[in-house]
């Protein structure tokens, strides 16, 4: 595995990030705005800024085919941004929520997107041609607390959600007139809107930080605040799961995860690094970290500054070393893990971003 490609964009937290399908455009959620970067050689250069929200932007996602960008924020709003000759044109989405929007993702079909919120509901949004605006339907029951994370099934109908009521759930987000009726699967056959196809608790009933369907859609993984990853294999409509496997770890909690094929999961979070899990219905285990633990070398200027700092510390405190640098590439919590390059068979590259203002592209 080659070394990671590190882009230290700024000294502020990155709440979320998303790449365009050609991987030349990068959208970064920074404070109240979304910054758009363009690939220029080996660097990303700031090209544009999407301004419309007046509170912290919590989610951003670029639709792979249309290139439209959806954003959501603590100001309880979501915008769909479309490219135009004069720049990016925003359209306000009618979310109808009275608490912060927490998370947003396009469905694979790109006909709709889902927004999680602190209002104990999920807004499933779609475009209404007659009125020329984006409207929403609400998934409410049986959610009892803030929705922290969402993930679409490959069929664009089923939607997984994690929340602070400690449950990971699978809902039907079928919208008549927008979706085609999906084929029967292990999650169910007839799937009217708001059908609960699965509801799961991990061993310690901790907050759920991340959810993700396997590439084939027949398994669900979720990360809890007890530092565990749980993998569920559904048993069919109205039947208990064939298997529900919890993998305890000694790390800090994970905040985001992706599948690498059907037999590997990559998760990252408060430990500032990504970890790999491998297994199947018979069992799962953590096999180790993605990165080699070598401290990045300092450049000449940094070495000079470090030497000056050392002598200053010796003079002021009587000690030579006060090194707070972590031996990981990220120097703070990783908020988002995304597939950068790959297919259903496996991931070739993935990207991470976090509180340290770094975006890192990893090669597997």
What do these predicted regions represent?
Residues 1-4, 34-47, 77-98, 109-112, ...:
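Per-blade loop-tip surfaces of WD-repeat and WD-like beta-propellers in eukaryotic adaptors/scaffolds
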Residues 1-79, 86, 111:
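Eukaryote-specific detector of the first structured module of a protein
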Residues 11-19, 55-62, 98-106, 144-152, ...:
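Canonical WD40 repeat/beta-propeller blade segments in eukaryotic WD-repeat proteins
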Residues 23-27, 66-70, 80, 110-114, ...:
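Structural hallmark of WD40 beta-propellers
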Residues 29-31, 72-75, 116-119, 162-165, ...:
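Conserved strand-to-loop turn within each blade of WD40 beta-propeller repeats
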Residues 76, 211, 228, 327-330:
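Feature marking well-ordered beta-strand scaffolds used for ligand recognition
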Residues 155-177, 208, 215:
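Beta-propeller domains
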Residues 178-199, 242-364:
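Terminal intrinsically disordered, low-complexity extensions flanking WD-repeat/beta-propeller proteins
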């Amino acid at each position: 595995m080659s070394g990671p490609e590190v882009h230290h964009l700024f000294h502020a937290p990155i709440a979320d990030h998303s790449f365009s399908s050609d991987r030349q455009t990068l959208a970064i959620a920074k404070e109240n705005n979304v910054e758009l970067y363009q690939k220029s050689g080996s660097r990303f250069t700031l090209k544009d800024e999407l301004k419309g929200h007046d509170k912290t932007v919590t989610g951003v996602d670029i639709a792979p085919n249309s290139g439209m960008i959806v954003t959501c924020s603590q100001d309880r709003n979501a915008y769909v941004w479309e490219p135009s000759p004069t720049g990016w044109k925003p359209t306000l989405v009618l979310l109808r929520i009275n608490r912060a929007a927490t998370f947003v993702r396009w469905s694979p079909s790109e006909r709709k997107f889902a927004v999680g919120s602190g209002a104990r509901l999920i807004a499933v949004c779609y475009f209404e041609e007659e009125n020329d605006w984006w409207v929403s339907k609400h998934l409410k029951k049986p959610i009892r607390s803030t929705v922290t994370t969402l993930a679409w099934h490959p069929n664009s109908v089923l939607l997984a959600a994690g929340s602070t009521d400690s449950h990971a759930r699978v809902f039907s987000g079928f919208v008549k007139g927008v979706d085609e009726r999906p084929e029967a699967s292990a999650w169910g056959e007839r799937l009217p809107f708001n059908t609960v196809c699965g509801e799961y608790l991990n061993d310690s009933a901790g907050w759920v930080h991340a959810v993700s369907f396997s590439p084939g859609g027949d398994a669900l993984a979720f990360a809890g605040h007890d530092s565990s990853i749980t993998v569920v294999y559904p048993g069919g409509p109205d039947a208990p799961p064939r298997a529900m496997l919890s993998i305890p770890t000694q790390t800090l909690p994970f905040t985001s995860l992706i599948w690498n094929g059907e037999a590997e999961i990559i998760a990252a979070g408060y430990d500032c690094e990504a970890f790999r899990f491998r297994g199947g219905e018979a069992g799962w285990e953590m096999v180790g970290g993605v990165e080699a633990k070598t401290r990045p070398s300092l450049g000449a200027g940094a070495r000079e500054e470090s030497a000056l700092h050392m002598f200053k510390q010796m003079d002021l405190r009587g000690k030579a070393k006060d090194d707070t640098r972590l031996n990981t590439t990220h120097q703070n919590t990783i908020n988002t893990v995304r597939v950068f390059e790959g297919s259903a068979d496996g991931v070739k590259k993935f990207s991470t971003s976090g509180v340290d203002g770094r975006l890192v592209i990893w090669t597997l």
